[in-house]
Amino acid sequence: MHRTIWRYFAVGLFVVGVAASLAGQQAPNDPSPLMLPGHRYDLPATPITAAQIEAHKKNMIAAKNDDVPMNMVKAGGGSDKHQVGVSVVNRNKGQKNPNYAVHDDVAEVYYVVEGKGRMKLGGKISDWKRRPVSAGNGRGSAGTTAVGARDVTIAKGDVLIIPAGTPHKWEDAEQFTSYVVVRVDPDGVAPLMELGTAKFTGAN
């Protein structure tokens, strides 16, 4: 009888001790941010102004470029490969892309700053072809036909998220359209690039 009571008492103390330990881990007394071993927390922020984006867009128009990265930086966290960058893309009125693009590694977030147009998104590409590594998009493939792709219209103020591996192409620009693209590169495939070092060297 006494042995049974002491056994339950010991188990109870053990459970209370484990619970207290977990509670201490979940709610530490130290209010500073959690610093995990092997993670980077010393990277600087990169402000990009509206004036810089506008100047970049105008340089692209003058050089007849349609997609030029502004920068690509280390994103920190648990992998030194993880990167994030910003590009500007311009589409002239009536411009269409003959091919779908699919990025192996890089996800994209579009923010439309001017104009309106239609895109084809998703589906299954039947005529895959590998393409050269892009400065902004890294590795990827292209194709002309995507079964099941859907039409999406994007306009000024809209945001569009395109995960890596999702086919997409510009179907028709109803007017001159410009959008900022945030590109997330988890494997560090695209080259790093400092803000202000963009090259405008003819149509992409």
Where are the language model's segments positioned?
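His/acidic/aromatic-lined binding-pocket segments of jelly-roll/cupin-type domains
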Residues: 101, 107-111, 151-152, 159-160
